[in-house]
Amino acid sequence: LAMIVDDVLHIVNSYCSNRRSDGMVTIEKFYKNGLYNPNYDDDLKRYKDIVMMLSDLVFEQTRLLNLILKRMRSYMPDYQIEAGKLMTDSVVEHNEYREDEETSSPYPGLKEYMIVRSTRNYHIGSGMIEI
């Protein structure tokens, strides 16, 4: 769990800004760097890739936390039973690993995750991106 949290924080610290008046953190729209950006198309693609990667990492965190709850409940059946299963706001289904993914360490780290995320039961991005 610490590894995935560290990877999310790395991306957030690299690309996010909290300049909003409501205190929310947003991804900096670096493709809008002034009046004219000769790299606009490439920068926009990179921005979208980062947004999709962060979203996929949130889905992965949800799967991992549900796996932890499942394993805890195998020893203590009533553990956090009132919490049920964890979900993200945008995806109600597909918030668990498939049986073949339930290894001792299902999150393989950021670089490897970029390769395997398209095999997960739900993802919005795929492939390697530059972080």
Language-model segments: residues:
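Long, low-complexity or tandemly repetitive, helically biased scaffold regions used
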Residues: 2-131
